[in-house]
């Protein structure tokens, strides 16, 4: 190879390498920005305002209310609920972070279990947090758990806000129970 051909080869190689580095760094910045966004930006500051929790799927529902500093199952004769389980749920919801946009196509939402709860064969769960005046603080459709997710917690769920079309992979460990026994205070 001549000196000129060799020089052109190395310049092209250098340009391709620089282009690849720039492309990768731009992509990682976008992913970082999204992953830093919380699903509900101000929820952590408003947790004390939550007075009602409603959880439902196509077949079951759990309703909780805060009465005299205790959480009760309003649909179960105001039976006292486990403070630990309620606080765990509220904290988990407030810490959920958007990791990656998944789909906006309505026909794909059932695969992630984030379709409308009222639809036939729906496997999604609707979580609604309300204040003392019955005003919605946060509302989220919670889908299936993500498998083998990388990240700080290694845990994730597919989620979608009911008024939005886009389903997201959210980072965080959120367990939503529709079994009354999981909510009962063991005392």
At which residue positions do the language-model features occur?
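Soluble, acidic/polar mature domains that operate outside membranes
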Residues: 1-187
């Amino acid at each position: 190879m001549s000196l000129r051909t060799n020089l052109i080869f190395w310049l092209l190689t250098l340009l391709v390498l620089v282009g690849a580095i720039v492309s990768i760094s731009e992509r990682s910045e976008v992913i970082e920005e999204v992953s830093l966004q919380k699903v509900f930006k101000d929820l952590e500051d408003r947790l004390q305002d939550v007075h009602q929790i409603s959880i439902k799927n196509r077949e079951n529902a759990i309703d909780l209310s805060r009465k005299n500093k205790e959480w009760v199952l309003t649909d179960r004769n105001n039976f006292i609920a486990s403070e630990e389980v309620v606080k765990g749920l509220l904290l988990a919801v407030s810490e959920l972070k958007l990791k990656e946009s998944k789909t906006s196509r309505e026909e794909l939402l059932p695969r992630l279990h984030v379709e409308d709860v009222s639809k036939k064969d729906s496997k999604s769960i609707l979580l609604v947090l309300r204040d003392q005046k019955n005003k919605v603080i946060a509302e989220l459709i919670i889908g299936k758990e993500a498998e083998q997710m990388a990240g700080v917690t290694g845990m994730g769920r597919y989620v979608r806000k009911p008024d939005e079309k886009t389903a997201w992979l959210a980072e965080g460990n959120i367990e939503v129970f529709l079994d009354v026994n999981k909510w009962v205070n063991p005392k």
